[in-house]
Amino acid sequence: MKKKICRKILFFLIVVAISFYFLVVRRDTNMVLSNVQANFQNLEIWLTTVDQKNLLKKQNTSDFVKKNVNKSKYIIKIDPKKKYQTMEGFGASLTDASAYLIAKVLPENEREKVLKKLFDYKEGIGISFLRQPMGASDYATKIYSYDDMPKDKSDFELKHFSINHDKEYIIPLLKKAMQINKQLKIMATPWSPPGWMKATDNMIGGSLWPDCYEVYANYFVKFINEYKKEGIEIYAITPQNEPLYVPPHYPGMSMSAEEQAEFIKNYLGPAFKKNNIKTKILCYDHNWDVPEYVMTVYKDKEAYKYISGSAWHCYAGSHETMTKIHNLFPDKEIWFTEASGGEWIPAFEKAFLDQMMHVIRAPRNWAETVVWWNIALDENNGPTVLPHSTCRGLVKIEQKTKKVIYNVDYYTLGHISKFVKPGAVRIDSNTYQNDLENVAFLNPDKSVVLIISNRTSESKIATVQYLNKNFNIYIPPKAAMTLCWK
């Protein structure tokens, strides 16, 4: 009798347990899955793969979000409450060469299409930042400044200053770009002052004469004001492109850290203040391998007060240098202002992985911008004043055929520029460096952007955790993925 009662009690308890499981546990599990689906029903996934079958292509979410898999060993935890830097923008340089190709080589209908593909968020990649050479760089149709003079002549009053060269095709394109993307910011950087200001009496080589510091500061003021008359605000400048390198074949100039500090504190900063110019001044604008340059400039307290931050290039050193400088000078901005694609890292696979590394690691090391180099070059990697060019633009415009080809650089930049808006804040996420790297942002409209790069030859499944929600995402080998949701 007792055994029968015990069996009945045991059976009853089993029935209760099973009922509890189906009614409560399974119900809660289904509710969680339903909530995840509801919370991420506006999830967008954009993919690029090295086989080029997907080039910044929007995907069906259901093909990549995996619901019935075990928790991945790759757990990407995103914390929107832990915030870092505010982003300024993403883009490249509309060099003289690039502007010439777009304005002079392409027919009007193709030109409009290319501009939309570059600057429009919906039809293109939404470039929101341009770094413009002040005068000729290595990628120009000729060597020129805004105040060229005959040999042994000077113009200390800048009576011959003119931006007419830029008015022909650079400024009209800048205006069109600004119409397409209202958030576009423009910074400017000289490769060289006019030759008469230098010891070489030439835009190639040399350094700035000490008695030309004042007129060179006024040259910046004149440039900013003349562009303003054209309806173009110059958001920021640097005093010199790559001041530690003096190129033998194109405009350039040596400027030591001590010289730059002297120029900023006694000439450029006061000239901006006197003329009520709000344009930001950033120092350096060269590679990560010499952080001492920035430290030396910043040690000058008078120069320091005029400087908004430092600008960095990718050709030597490591991204972590920017974090080092941020930690030493947390009140100063960090900008990543030049990374060119080229034959030294061939497309597609090697260049793709290299550039996605910059897209992710630069912001993770406090950079507020990600900026490639030439927007457009031709089939010979020009126009250029160089005897030989190995650089690659975002776009190739063939002068003979008028054909337009979008290079790997276009798609890598697009993974961030199309989705992360100016004013977005980088938010915390853990990364798996050299494996499954990522960076996360919170846009001004409260949408979240997660950029993932799978640097390995194997597909991965990662668990993305955001607040109290999570989902599993499949990432193909050697691929980049941008995810967006609200």
PLM-predicted stretches and their roles:
Residues M1-L13:
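N-terminal Sec-pathway targeting helices
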Residues L56-I234, N266:
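N-terminal catalytic cores of secreted or lumenal carbohydrate-active enzymes
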Residues E88, E123-L130, N181-K185, E230-A236, ...:
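Loop/turn elements at helix/coil->beta-strand transitions in domains of secreted/extracellular proteins
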Residues A92, G126, I186, I237, ...:
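Conserved, mostly hydrophobic/aromatic
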Residues V215-A236, P243-E343:
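Active-site neighborhood of glycoside hydrolase catalytic domains
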Residues E333-T412, D428-T431:
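Aromatic/acidic polysaccharide-binding cleft in carbohydrate-active enzymes
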Residues K418, S429-L467, K478:
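Carbohydrate-binding surface patches
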Residues I475-K486:
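C-terminal beta-strand-rich structural cap/linker in extracellular carbohydrate-active enzymes
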